[in-house]
Amino acid sequence: MAKVISIHSFRGGTGKSNTTANVAAVLAAGGARVAIVDTDIQSPGIHVLFGMDDRPEPTLNDYLWGKVGIRDAAHDVTDRIRRIATVADGGALHLVPSSIRPGDIARVLRDGYDVAALNDGLRTLARELELDYLFIDTHPGMNEETLLSITISDILIVILRPDRQDFQGTAVTIDVARRLDVPERSEEHTSELQSRGLISYAVFC
C-alpha cells in the first residue's frame, strides 16, 4: 500500500514544491513507484519543475469536475529524471498537475470543489498505478483541502522559514495534525527517509 506524504507550509515561498519534486524524483530514481498530486489548485506550479507545458492537460481540475478519470490526469514524467540521473528498474514518477488557466482558478476560488472526490481520487491513483509513495503538494495555510490532506497522510512534512510568523503558524499546523490523529508512525518513516538521505529540514508529527 502506498505511503501518503503531504508536504506543507504555513506560508508560500518556503521551497515546498521544490522539496516535493526533488524527494519524489530521488525515490523514483531509486526504483520506487511514485506520484505527485498538485493540490495547490489556487496557485499551481510544480509542473514547471518537470518541464511541462504552461497549460498541461488533462489536470486535477478536469478530474474533480468529472471530465476525466484520475489516472488520465496522471502524466508520466520519468523521462525528465532520466535526463539527469539513472532510474533503477521499476522506478517511475507520475504527476497530476493543477490547471493554470485563469478561468479554472477563478472557478475553484468561486465554487470550490468536492474534497471527498479528491480523497477518492488519491486512493484510486495509488491503487491503479501500484504506487509505493504518493506525495501531496498542498496549498499553503489551513483550509478544508489542507485538512483533508493531513487527515489521510501517513507522513506530514512541514517546511518553514526561520522567522517568527512561520514558527507560530507551523506550531498551529502541527497541533492541528495531532488533533486529527495523523498516524503516529513518524519514527519509522523518518528513519526510512533519512536512510535515503532525503530529510534535511522537516517537522514531523
Please place each PLM-identified region on the residue numbering.
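Residue-level signature of catalytic and energy-coupling elements of molecular machines
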Residues: G12, I46, Y63, V96, ...
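Phosphate-binding loop that captures ATP/GTP phosphates
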Residues: R33-V34, Q42-L95
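Conserved catalytic-core segment of NTP-binding enzymes
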Residues: A116-S191, S195-R196, S200
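A short local structural element in Rossmann-fold oxidoreductases
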Residues: I46-H47, A106, L147
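Walker A/P-loop phosphate-binding motif and the immediately C-terminal alpha-helix
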Residues: A2-Q42
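Short, well-ordered alpha-helices that flank and scaffold nucleotide-derived cofactor binding pockets
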Residues: A25-A29, V48, T151, D175
